[in-house]
């Protein structure tokens, strides 16, 4: 079957109530999309891809992956919480929300510069090439100018180490996004979590439109977007399709797409949710790879619970980034020694910092820091 035809540069409107049972699913014989331009899929087309038998889907996604990426190269990222707990949002999965009184977590103040710099040094020495910093707040607008300047200085210092820098700080204004870019930020993470239809069951203190407004501010500043979602929130397959449709029809495909498996933290409203299976994650990875062929697809939270076989299939189907280190914000992560053994068994190698990315903004085409100044390298 031929690949669905290329769409215009403007994403199509969401498809609602449209029957897809008669649509032919993607097959392993489908040629991979051209690496020269993005293809926008309708929601019904993404549903047809998602519903393809898993082995056929993984095979087709692997062909797309190899057309756009070195299949043996995997990016290694480290994520650090620079401000833990006390968040005013009520996201049902999050241990850092101040609404969830039963969670055993003590709120902390914004970290100092030296401790963050030392953590980045350790991450670089361990082989990470991207350092991500997360703060549990609604957004920088809720903190004072001195704290905001401290965050900007964190970005500058980590960037000065020759590492890619990502932050996840909640909702941004266009002015804040521009300041982060000026400080040397590589990418900004702001997950949309799930589909527009299911989002009200995840959070009531902000809207899906709030999420999209931050992504628009980030893209408007020329900063690369890192945006993904969480599998296991109680959503159905249609919501997973809706999540991927939202991401795949942004004005530009995200530079990075994190696929998280819910880590059910005791004391949160979602503590009793059953975890997604490894094959659920593989299906989402493979679909993301087909519909966003040039984006980096990251195995993120919950990877510790995936078997080596699940991870191997995910890498085959298009995953090409992981978080390493023993912790992701407040939850446990896969062991670095286990990762080294898995990479060795699969013949994987680490992606160097500052290779140009196939998707994302200008900040993903920026070279290494030389003498404190940023040197631009166009793809």
Model-inferred region functions:
Residues 80, 169, 207, 229-232, ...:
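Glycine- and other small-residue-rich loops at beta-strand/loop junctions that grip anionic moieties
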Residues 80-98:
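Local cysteine-cluster metal-coordination motifs and their immediate loop/turn environment
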